[in-house]
Structures are given as structure tokens and as C-alpha cells.
Amino acid sequence: MAIILGVDPGSRITGYGVINCVGRQQIYVGSGCIRTSSDELPIRLKQIFDGLSEIIRQYQPDEFAIERVFMAKNADSALKLGQARGAAIVAATAANLPVAEYSATQIKSAVVGTGRAQKAQVQHMIQQLLKLPSAPQADAADALGVAVCHYHTCQSLAALGGRANVRTYGRYK
């Protein structure tokens, strides 16, 4: 049994999703968004750190997975996204959680079956996979997708290596 916290980072909205993995079953635990104020970036980064630290205390996850930075046309946006990711990763490492990172293509492939899936397709599949009554908000669905991707990656590695331990994958020390 493992509780996985998935995070879709953003400097304005950071999505989070928590699933409990029991055997081959993925059970929805919770999800939502951390919406930062329109204050200066350092204050928003602290809000992300504090928000995720509280979520970690509330849900007590065993593993932490986050979406990797993508290349953006706007360098300033990419830098802010990288800083938001950093705040999220520090919250995880402060709680001694192993950190895994996945690209958007890996996440979409794990959830939908194609790395070129649209946001609406990810939302629909997350609703189906986790048996939710309605589709979650886009950022929360993306975060749940990160958690589902991590679960599938762990299952695949374990199948390949017997008792492979993916906790070392992407771990920050």
C-alpha cells in the first residue's frame, strides 16, 4: 500500500492529487489547487511551499511525483515555473519524501495512452480511472495524472526487476 502525492506546478495555480495504491487498484483520496495571491513571486513561492507542506501533513503520502519543466516560448514563464517546482520539491524533501519527475508526454501516455492528449482527454480518463462522479478541475486532474503515472512506472519497474525500488528514481539529497 502506498499513498502517492502528484503535483502539477505553477506559479499562479499548483494542482495536487492524492491516490492510495492497494495492489493493482488506485483509489482517489483527494485533490485540489493551491491558488497563490497576486503578490510578488517570492511570496507566491512561499505560499506553494506552505500549501504543499500542509497537504503533506494532512495526507501523509509515501511518495511524491511532480511534472518536469517543459520548454516554454516565454523564458520568464519557464523560470517562474522552475521556481514553483523548486518550492514544491523542497516541501517534499523537507518531509523526507522521495521525489520522482515525469514529463508531460510520459504523464499523458500513462493516463490516456498517447503523449499528445488534450487536457479534456486527461480529465476524462482520470475521472474514469479513479471512478470519480465528475471530471476534476484541469490542474487537479493533471496532478492526479502525475500520481497515476508514478504508480504505473513503479509497477512496470517492479515487474521488470522483481522487487525493484523506484524510490531512488529522481531522488534529491
UniProtKB/Swiss-Prot annotation:
Binds 2 Mg(2+) ion per subunit. It catalyses: Endonucleolytic cleavage at a junction such as a reciprocal single-stranded crossover between two homologous DNA duplexes (Holliday junction). It is found in: Cytoplasm. Transmembrane segments: none annotated. Its cofactor is Mg(2+). GO terms for cellular component: cytoplasm; Holliday junction resolvase complex. The keyword rRNA processing does not apply. Mg(2+) 2 binds at E67. It comes from the Bacteria. Mg(2+) 1 binds at D8, D139. Its main location: cytoplasm. GO terms for biological process: DNA recombination; DNA repair. GO terms for molecular function: crossover junction DNA endonuclease activity; DNA binding; magnesium ion binding. Its EC number is 3.1.21.10. It holds the Pfam family RuvC. InterPro entries: RNaseH-like_sf (IPR012337), RNaseH_sf (IPR036397), X-over_junc_endoDNase_Mg_BS (IPR020563), X-over_junc_endoDNase_RuvC (IPR002176). The active site is at D8, E67, D139. The keyword Cytoplasm applies. Keywords: Cytoplasm, DNA damage, DNA recombination, DNA repair, DNA-binding, Endonuclease, Hydrolase, Magnesium, Metal-binding, Nuclease. The RuvA-RuvB-RuvC complex processes Holliday junction (HJ) DNA during genetic recombination and DNA repair. Endonuclease that resolves HJ intermediates. Cleaves cruciform DNA by making single-stranded nicks across the HJ at symmetrical positions within the homologous arms, yielding a 5'-phosphate and a 3'-hydroxyl group; requires a central core of homology in the junction. The consensus cleavage sequence is 5'-(A/T)TT(C/G)-3'. Cleavage occurs on the 3'-side of the TT dinucleotide at the point of strand exchange. Homodimer which binds Holliday junction (HJ) DNA. The HJ becomes 2-fold symmetrical on binding to RuvC with unstacked arms; it has a different conformation from HJ DNA in complex with RuvA. In the full resolvosome a probable DNA-RuvA(4)-RuvB(12)-RuvC(2) complex forms which resolves the HJ. Belongs to the RuvC family. This is Crossover junction endodeoxyribonuclease RuvC. It comes from Shewanella halifaxensis (strain HAW-EB4). The gene is ruvC.
